[in-house]
UniProtKB/Swiss-Prot annotation:
Residues bearing carbohydrate: N591, N630
Extracellular side, ranges: 18-633
Residue spans, topological domain Cytoplasmic: 663-667
Protein name: Major surface trophozoite antigen 11
Recorded domain comment: Contains 27 repeats of a CXXC motif.
InterPro entries linked: EGF-like_dom (IPR000742), Furin_repeat (IPR006212), Giardia_VSA (IPR052798), Giardia_VSP (IPR005127), Growth_fac_rcpt_cys_sf (IPR009030)
Major localization listed first in the record, in broad terms: membrane
Residues annotated as signal peptide: 1-17
Record keywords: Cell membrane, Glycoprotein, Membrane, Repeat, Signal, Transmembrane, Transmembrane helix
Ranges that cross the membrane: 634-662
Length: 667
């Protein structure tokens, strides 16, 4: 029967003796699995299989006087603890192959340590004061290649931790960590769920594969978003990209983030803001503000924005003035970039000089002004009834001789003879158009029956006109409900943005319409694309499909676009803001939400980047300045009130003095 010598050190396995209190020395019991064993017996006893037996009557212990290496146990390989600690033992009683979670130290002999736990934390002595040690928290390991010298314990190499992550830096030492040290990230391999600390620069070749980031000193592992790394800190002279996926050289100073292509600054250190591709110092708390009065105070007023932004009437900074509505990018009295109101009456957009570029519907550009169209037109090129370029809903446009403008009137009516319509079977934008002509050799061209001699363009192929319809249009024209249509004119341009050059089919349908097999299909309200009139496949902006509905529901008034529910906004409507990332509800600029404070009278805003504090209000109700705060810290409304009061006081004083001197003169 083979026995092996096992060595136990009072450590994390230590247990108070409960079963051998009369024979085992106090505090010399340990647990191996669920079994309590004694590692050092009272005088006259020796531990065999963890139990104290009479030393003189037991031949299994070759040396019962060991005192240099206390806590040794001889154990049979057929029972606990022997079969728990060792799988193979030599004839002289030395374990040669340790069980899982244990290792055989180098140069073990029958009178010294034969097997030790991978998680042993206390140095263990061999002959000649050689020492070895396990790794705290280690589950499986390999033995050191050679024993350490005195006072320098040689550590086992851990291959898997009981919990936490296995950390094995390049020098070959190993440890088990709850969190990986800086420069590493915790990776759980698909195979065996092995947890290891992997280098930020090296990544992991074990599944799931993770690509490392060169020159990264500190990283975060994003397991939920595709097993990717983001770098929080790069090596000297390098900075992470804005998305933190690379470390790059920077061309500028005071950069916090730099691009991988060219090294341009993408973000700045604290106390600096990005102006173009450079970081400039700024003490202002207003976002994207370069210069201000009363920096960081409650009455701070931005006086100049960074080069890519413009001052709003409320002294905030925005990149695009058009976001404020009827404003354009201009300059203020100090020649600083600022958003200016387009003051041309009935103008929709102004250029950078404040000149009108496009007029509102119902008006046309007349020099520098917007003049009214004829009341019958929706849009026009001039002011007469024959200058309409688009008609109101329910009215049809009849083009004049030049083919660019015409008159708006009632839609299709039926009649008899040449040029008359037999069936008004097509409706677009509320107006009816002809689908079958009364004369057999005529067909609807742009919705109107036209005789052969009156046609300026042969839109129907020869020999394809019969029974008042066209069965095959000339390539480049749209065949729709018995007629041929130009997609550059109404009503064709209402439903199709272009016909195929080699066919008479629609190349790009206008959202809300579909032309299939020469028939117009009108999608349900709010639907951009559909398979038929009642089955929507994609809703338009401002609408959403709810659950399994085949139609679209209008978004809440707080949403410009929404998804899944009417109040779940993707983009907020003007006058509203979101406090959460992604899709969520929008709150009025005037109201508070989740730590963000609204501003009464605010018409256009954004949440603060810090997610707390007041909204960034870009436009206020009332005056053109929007009640902006000026350098004194008073709103323009307050200043106006003070000015009026001052005028009244001065006028009263002058009147009093006049009366006084006149009366005194008479006296």
């Amino acid at each position: 029967m083979l026995l092996a010598i096992f060595y136990f050190v009072i450590s994390t396995l230590t247990a108070k003796c409960t079963t051998q209190t009369q024979t085992c020395e106090a505090e010399k019991c340990e647990m191996v699995g669920e079994t309590e064993i004694c590692t050092r017996c009272q005088t006259g006893k020796v531990p065999i299989d963890g139990k104290c037996v009479d030393a003189t009557a037991n031949a299994n212990c070759k040396n019962a006087s060991g005192d240099g290496d206390a806590n040794q146990v001889c154990g049979k390989m057929s029972s606990v603890p022997g079969n728990t600690l060792c799988t193979t033992v030599s004839p002289d009683g030395v374990c040669s192959v340790a069980a899982n979670e244990y290792f055989v130290p180098p140069n073990a002999d029958a009178t010294h340590d034969s097997v030790v736990s991978c998680s042993e934390e206390t140095p263990i002595h061999l002959a000649n004061n050689k020492q070895y040690i396990g790794v705290a928290g280690c589950a499986t390991c390999s033995a050191p290649k050679a024993p350490g010298e005195d006072n320098t314990p040689k550590a086992a190499t851990c291959t898997k931790c009981a919990a936490g992550f296995l950390h094995t830096p390049s020098e070959g030492l190993s440890s088990c960590e709850e969190t990986c040290p800086e420069g590493y990230f915790g990776h759980t391999a698909t195979a065996e769920s092995k947890k290891t600390c992997k280098s930020c620069t090296g990544g992991s070749s074990e599944a799931p594969n993770v690509k490392g980031i060169g020159d990264c000193l500190k990283c975060m592992y994003n397991e939920a978003s595709g097993n990717t790394l983001t770098c929080e800190k790069c090596s000297a002279q390098k900075k992470p990209s804005l998305d933190k996926t690379s470390c790059n050289d920077c061309t500028g100073q005071n950069c916090a983030f730099c691009s991988s292509s060219g090294g341009d600054c993408e973000g700045c250190d604290s106390g600096f803001i990005l102006d173009g591709q450079n970081c400039v110092k700024s003490d202002c708390k207003t976002e994207n503000c370069k210069a201000c009065t009363n920096p960081k105070a409650a009455n701070e007023v931005c006086t100049e924005c960074i080069s890519t932004h413009h001052l709003t009437p409320t002294s905030q900074c925005v990149q695009y003035c058009q976001a404020l509505g009827n404003y354009y990018a201009g300059t203020n009295a100090d020649n600083k970039k600022a958003c200016k109101e387009c003051t041309v009456a009935n103008c929709k957009t102004c250029n950078d000089q404040g000149q009108c570029q496009t007029c509102n519907d119902g008006f046309y550009k007349n020099g520098d002004a917007c003049s009214p169209c004829h009341e019958s037109c929706k849009t026009c090129s001039a002011g007469t009834a024959s200058d309409c370029t688009e008609c109101p809903t329910g009215k049809a446009l009849k083009y004049g001789n030049d083919g660019t403008k015409g008159t708006c009137g009632e839609g299709c009516t039926t009649g008899q003879g040449s040029g008359a319509c037999k069936t008004c079977g097509l409706t677009i934008d509320g107006a009816s158009y002809c689908s079958e002509c009364d004369t057999q050799n005529e067909y609807p061209q742009n919705g109107i029956c036209t005789s052969t001699t009156a046609r300026t363009v042969a839109t129907c192929k020869n020999s394809n006109v019969a029974n008042g319809i066209c069965s095959s249009c000339t390539n480049g024209f749209l065949r729709m409900n018995g007629g041929c249509y130009e997609t550059t004119k109404f009503p064709g341009k209402s439903v199709c943005e272009g016909a195929n050059a080699d066919a008479d089919t629609c190349k790009a349908p206008v959202p809300g319409y579909k032309v299939e097999a020469g028939k117009l299909v009108m999608c349900s309200k709010g639907c951009d694309t559909c398979s038929d009139a009642t089955t929507c496949t994609k809703c338009g902006d401002g609408y959403t499909k709810i659950e399994n509905s085949q139609t679209c529901t209008k978004c809440d008034s707080s949403c410009e676009t929404c998804t899944g529910a009417a109040t779940t906004c993707k983009v907020c409507a003007t006058g509203y803001y979101k406090t959460a990332l992604g899709e969520s509800t929008c709150t009025s600029c005037e109201n508070d939400s989740n730590g963000v404070i609204g501003v009464k009278g605010c018409l256009n805003c954004a949440p603060p980047s810090s997610s707390t504090g007041s909204v960034l209000c870009y436009l206020m109700k009332g005056e053109n300045t929007g009640g902006s705060v000026n350098k004194s810290g008073l709103s323009t409304g307050a200043i106006a009130g003070i000015s009026v009061a001052a005028v009244v006081v001065v006028a009263g004083l002058v009147g009093f003095l006049c009366w006084w001197f006149i009366c005194r003169g008479k006296a």
